[in-house]
UniProtKB/Swiss-Prot annotation:
<keyword id="KW-0165">Cleavage on pair of basic residues</keyword>
<keyword id="KW-0528">Neurotoxin</keyword>
<feature type="signal peptide">
    <location>
        <begin position="1"/>
        <end position="22"/>
    </location>
</feature>
<keyword id="KW-0732">Signal</keyword>
<keyword id="KW-0325">Glycoprotein</keyword>
<keyword id="KW-0873">Pyrrolidone carboxylic acid</keyword>
<protein>
    <recommendedName>
        <fullName>Contulakin-G</fullName>
    </recommendedName>
</protein>
<keyword id="KW-1213">G-protein coupled receptor impairing toxin</keyword>
<keyword id="KW-0800">Toxin</keyword>
<feature type="propeptide">
    <location>
        <begin position="23"/>
        <end position="50"/>
    </location>
</feature>
<feature type="modified residue" description="Pyrrolidone carboxylic acid">
    <location>
        <position position="51"/>
    </location>
</feature>
<dbReference type="GO" id="GO:0090729">
    <property type="term" value="F:toxin activity"/>
</dbReference>
<comment type="similarity">
    <text>Belongs to the conotoxin C superfamily.</text>
</comment>
<feature type="propeptide">
    <location>
        <begin position="67"/>
        <end position="76"/>
    </location>
</feature>
<dbReference type="GO" id="GO:0005576">
    <property type="term" value="C:extracellular region"/>
</dbReference>
<keyword id="KW-0582">Pharmaceutical</keyword>
<feature type="region of interest" description="Disordered">
    <location>
        <begin position="51"/>
        <end position="76"/>
    </location>
</feature>
Length: 76
C-alpha cells in the first residue's frame, strides 16, 4: 500500500513540476506519451492480437485501422 502511495505522489510531482515552470497541462501530458503512439496504432495492435489469439497467424496479417466510417458492433 505504501508503494502505491509513493508511486501516486511521484506521478503528481512528475506532472506538477513542469507546470510550476510555466508549462501547460496539455503539453506536459503529451510529453509523457511517445510521439509514435497513436490511437490508430493501438487499436490496430489490439485487433491484430485478438485475431492471432483466435488462431490466425499474426505474421501474415496487417493490423486493421479503425476508421470513423466503420461501424462498431455493440457487445452483449
Amino acid at each position: 500500500m505504501q508503494t502505491a502511495y509513493w508511486v501516486m505522489v511521484m506521478m503528481m510531482v512528475w506532472i506538477a513540476a513542469p507546470l510550476s515552470e510555466g508549462g501547460k497541462l496539455n503539453d506536459v501530458i503529451r510529453g509523457l506519451v511517445p510521439d509514435d503512439i497513436t490511437p490508430q496504432l493501438i487499436l490496430g495492435s489490439l485487433i491484430s492480437r485478438r485475431q492471432s489469439e483466435e488462431g490466425g497467424s499474426n505474421a501474415t496479417k496487417k493490423p486493421y485501422i479503425l476508421r470513423a466510417s466503420d461501424q462498431v458492433a455493440s457487445g452483449p
